[in-house]
Amino acid sequence: MDNSGFSWGPSISDLANDPVYGGNVQNEYTKGGLHNGQYYVPQRAAAGLDPWATPQAYNNAKDFFQTGVTWSNSVNVAQSFDKGNYSFSLGNTTSDGIVRSTGMDRYNVKLSGEAQLHDNWTTGFNGNFVTSKIKKQGTANDGVTATVYTAPISYTMAGIPSHIEGDPYTQNTFRENWIDDGNWACDNNSFTERSQRFFGNAFLKYSTKFGTDNHKLDVKYQIGDDAYTTNYSDIYGYGTTGYTNGYASEYGFTVNEMNSLLTFTYNWNINEDFVFDALLGNELVDKRISNTQAVGYSFNFPGWNHLNNASVFNSSHEYKRKRTVGNFASLSLAWKNMLYLNVTGRNDIVSSMPRDNRSFFYPSVSLGWVFTEVEALKNDILTFGKIRGSYAEVGMAGEYVPSYYYTPGYGGGFFQGTPIMYPINGNMAYIPYFVVYDPNLKPQNTKSYELGADLTFLNGLVSLNYTYSRQNVKDQIFEVPLAGSTGASSMMMNGGKMHSNVHEITLGISPVDTKNFKLDFAFNFSKIDNYVDELAPGVESIMLGGFVTPQVRAGIGDKFPVIYGVGYKRDGEGRIVVNEKGIPEAGETQVIGKVSPDFRLGFNTNIELYKFRLAAVFDWKQGGQMYSGTAGETNFYGTSKLSGEVRKSDKYHFDYAAVEQKGVDADGKPIYVPYTGGVKGSDAEEYFKSVRGIDEAYVYDNSFLKLRELSLSYPVYKKDNLNVNVNVFARNIIVWSEIKGFDPEATQGNNNMAGAFERFSLPGTSSYGFGVNVNF
């Protein structure tokens, strides 16, 4: 049994005969006598238990995870009067996660009201307050699942304490010096998020018809605010891997966004054929962000995980303010409920861009024709038909930050930790920030072209909608790498052009609609293809996130985004090159996967039979790829199903492989011939240790078909003003995917990496529940 974490060790059936730990043979641990049929477990000895165990298989994942439970409760009160109304709601959601010490508590309150002060004057408001506390555990390399997934099945995490006897701060784990034991992490590490948020608005509206029925003017002023504070507390307890003496971080954001909106809305029924609408408006958005952070390392003594116990301490504060002023207008003209023309324009002035590029204008125009309003085209089959087209521009400001100085932190080149932090002996240090901003930075611009049709057949029996759109994006704002000689690592600049082709189709069918039986279906199809056309001069691709390898990148000519990493070595015919044992060789760093799917198709149905209502939602994603770090690590450590199968097989091989022969051909190139052998079970460990360095080996097709939700509801009581409904539901109960055991939509990293990577993710879950709704 090898505690280094880098050897598979013997099979369960051979543990008792292991030359180092086996109880059937003479070794260091059997000097006092043999322990037939058993083997010595150092971790049991360290925990003060009987060190001898009978070999057997354990299910560490089953022992570690628990059944998550969520409770949701809400109450809503609403009432209407002759000249007003109000509503009040209160809700609470409490959940326990599938990992102990994780969960959420959330409370929300909403109050709204509206009153007619006069024939021409109306006022109203709505306010929402939400407070939540979320308890989490780490993911990826810091994840609690890392040891759960990589511990050999002969080792019981549940049966062996996670710390040595008498010392709760020294871990007792099979994979020491790499990652925290999952149970130890749940007991000693914590990641807490506390949030409070208020958002709402109030308005005053004046309406007049000028004494006629053909004109109407609404003048409305609305002021709103969205303010929230989120505080995070990250604790790595004394004895954690990487931060041996502990780590504490307290950081938080306070965001306040005020919105002032003034609109003038005018409606004019010119005559029986023409209707004119106009909208003029002004919007002011003022956003303030305050960010504070305090970090402490190396606790003076264990047992008190607090910043005040840190021997190395650092803190920082950041404040940002952004203001946007927008003026906009919209003009619409309708003719005979048949032709609709709309023209809009908006000009924004932002404070977050360089002074010369703060103002930008973006217009739009759209035209729609309801051709079934033409008398000659009216019929009982196609009861509604509309063709539409539009052109629009959208401007999006970036964030320009003048050069500034910051206090650096220097790592020691090892996993986790920042051992050198200022102040040092009371002295601070400041250096220029490593990202610089182009002083000519300008807003990103998107031009969109759209064509579509909306069709309804047989008075709503069938509905069909299709939309094609093309988006051309220019002046994208990217962080472009710079040469080290510049004194900076990268520059934020306008560095790209992209285009997107989008196809969307919705189909609705309602074949049955009777008093006691209703049936309807709906399909939603979407195909979105994004391509990178240009980047900054001299830049072929940009890293969006990831590791040294693999990475998520945006590359010229590639579908956005792509997975970039070490691929298989291939010959001129595209065959994977293997050695004489059938073990593949590493090739060049290249594009090894495309993240975006070919298409998505959603399907939902509702069936009402008497008072029962059954609903189902399916989702099909076709295409797209994901890198699975979990698969790579569990194969490497020999704990995956595949590694067990290869270990037992006589000939595991690639269907399309080649092996290099001695010598070269007439052109001086290597000679490759088809490989017909395979990896022997005895070489399985060598095989998986080799392919660990080939990222392409763990890029999987990310297609899936999900039964997202199945629900059944029934009104059990209805009398006078009292209605009682009950419902049951199941979510994610069926998933077909090449990636087994995990949710194919699991993802880690920033938004640019969404759907591209997973590493030590939590297992996929299904949920079952019931609900009771009472209305009176």
Where are the language model's segments positioned?
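Short, conserved phosphate-binding/catalytic loop or strand-edge motifs used
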Residues: Y236-T240
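Surface-exposed, extracytoplasmic segments of Gram-negative outer-membrane nutrient-acquisition systems
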Residues: V41-A53, A61, G426-F434, N472-K497, ...
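Residues embedded in well-ordered regular secondary structure
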Residues: M1-R100, G138-N141, A185-T192, G200-S207, ...
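A generic structural motif
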Residues: T94-D96, I349-S351, P511-D513, P597, ...
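A mature extracytoplasmic/lumenal domain signature
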Residues: N92, G127, F618-W620, S711
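Aromatic-residue-lined binding/catalytic grooves and analogous aromatic/hydrophobic interfacial grooves
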Residues: A53, F603, V774
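Extracellular/periplasmic, surface-exposed regions of secreted and cell-surface proteins
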Residues: R106, S112-W121, N126-T131, T139-I235, ...
